[in-house]
Amino acid sequence: VKEEQISYKYKRNEDIQMIITKTPFRMSFFGGGTDMPSFFQENGGAVLSTTFDKYCYVNVRHLPRFFDYSTELSYSKTERVTDVEDIQHPAIRNAMKFLDMHEIRLTYEADLPARSGLGTSSSFAVGMLNAFYALKGKYADKKKLADEAIYLERELCMEAGGWQDQIAASFGGFNRINFTDEGYEVLPIIISPERKKQLNQNLMMFFTGFTRFSSDVQKANAAGKVDKTAQLKEMLSLVDEAEKVLTDKSISLDEFGRMLDHTWKLKRQTGSAVSTSNIDILYDKGIKAGALGGKLLGAGGGGFLVFYVQSDKQSAVREAMKELMYIPFNFEDGGTRVIHYTPESYEPLV
């Protein structure tokens, strides 16, 4: 009898639906911090960023009723629950309630570690919402996914932060994102393929490791509750300058690297969490080896250092950074997408 019930529920094994979404991580070059509503609603904001070919994958399907739990989640740990309210992961719990999801199995995997300064949590939020809509058989465009990921993280999960990560993960590509009191707009950077390729080749990324900086960062963050409006306004003006460097062929691309160095120094002046001694030492090593400038992407649980390096200096920078993992990457334009979609005949009972 049991076998008949099962075959009735799933006419064929391939009728069990599975969705896999693929969502890129982002690197932000200029304007970080001006994407906070507390700043841009009064002053306007803008960010220059790109997504690149490192992704997170969210696999979602309905969970067959063979188990004494109705939802199974697999990320850095495994959760098995019968009630959505019992889910520990805030983003998954709130997203499931928000979109009225029940009886699912969700698996998260990523090319790079979480909490490492690449907007990983927002890429996950966007990819998860994309997968949930696909599971429901509904289409959600990039703006809807970005807006709802912002709402999920900032309102439902009450996590502090800006808006740029969710927008970048959703839309993909090399963009200028403008923020006003009325919302945001995503404007692709008009740069020739050759120049974009050259920029990509001149950027080198290194992983600094996980926990070295977290206590320094927490102390600095606690002590750093000062007004940064003037600094953020200067960061905002740099977005215009950086965009001009990228789009104007008469300007050397090396200016982009020098501007990264300028921003680094600007951030240092505020005594922000960026200026931990270990990272300063690594940054200075890179500059001494020939990098024109660089940027720490994130801090806390870990981080990535990106340097702008002319081709003839790259081997020297690799040697100077030999203690760190080097991560080659390419820019990408796709944003979040569904890469596997199997329709199903199974209906959850809830």
Region locations from a protein language model:
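Short, Lys/Arg-enriched N-terminal segments with co-localized hydrophobic residues
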Residues: 1-17
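C-terminal nucleotide
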Residues: 13-30, 35-37, 41, 47-49, ...
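Core catalytic loop region at the nicotinamide-binding pocket of NAD(P)H-dependent oxidoreductases
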Residues: 103
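N-terminal pre-triad scaffold of radical SAM enzymes
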Residues: 106-114
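Short aromatic-hydrophobic micro-motifs that form the base-stacking/packing surface
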Residues: 116, 295
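DPxDG-like acidic metal-binding loop motif
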Residues: 118-138, 142, 170
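Glycine-rich active-site/cofactor-binding loop and its immediate structural neighborhood
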Residues: 302
